[in-house]
């Protein structure tokens, strides 16, 4: 019986963003099945062979081995190399997924096993570490949907993403509610907050400088006014300014 060392310390690579499809290999499988060079591997009760979806339990693991999700250091690769050395073709007359799973029980280490099949559009492949013929530890899961292979997210990634989305939405809701809440305390009751004027900008400084220059020119022009106007002002003083209401600052209730 072949043995392997303990599982590697590194975590499995995250390929959740990868979608893999091999049209050339699928076309080759369709050609083999349409010409009768390989059995369909389906029960008599299953649907008729569909050239557009040639995957079956018999060839889906060979198709999965062409994807970046497959590990060449696995026991599946060792079995495939042994079959090639013995002249056994995996696609025509070779062992299927069930036979390969039974063969993998003789090894310990990394392996890929077909755990669910609904031909020809849905397959689930599990990556696991085998420590004995009866004990395995799941590491990752992959599913084949309509000839495309994906990596299934683990429970930790799903919960972390959902919790992060929930916390973000809750924080935004509380921030909006905080800005819209009324200002109230038992001692003062409802009260408003005065709006503080913004600091002067460079545009305001230029405007003030222009007004100062204009007032200076006006003052020089008034120096040439006849003294008669000043005497008339002393004789007939201007009427008192009309009473104006005090200006109130605008307030907003937060």
Curated annotation (Swiss-Prot):
The keyword Protein biosynthesis does not apply. GO terms for cellular component: core mediator complex; mediator complex. InterPro entries: Mediator_Med6, Mediator_Med6_sf. Residues 219-236 have a biased composition (Basic and acidic residues). It is found in: Nucleus. GO terms for molecular function: transcription coactivator activity. The keyword Nucleus applies. GO terms for biological process: regulation of transcription by RNA polymerase II. Residues 205-254 are annotated as: Disordered. Keywords: Activator, Nucleus, Transcription, Transcription regulation. Residues 205-216 have a biased composition (Polar residues). Its main location: nucleus. PANTHER family: MED-6-RELATED (PTHR13104). Belongs to the Mediator complex subunit 6 family. Component of the Mediator complex, a coactivator involved in the regulated transcription of nearly all RNA polymerase II-dependent genes. Mediator functions as a bridge to convey information from gene-specific regulatory proteins to the basal RNA polymerase II transcription machinery. Mediator is recruited to promoters by direct interactions with regulatory proteins and serves as a scaffold for the assembly of a functional preinitiation complex with RNA polymerase II and the general transcription factors. Component of the Mediator complex. This is Mediator of RNA polymerase II transcription subunit 6. It comes from Mycosarcoma maydis (Corn smut fungus).
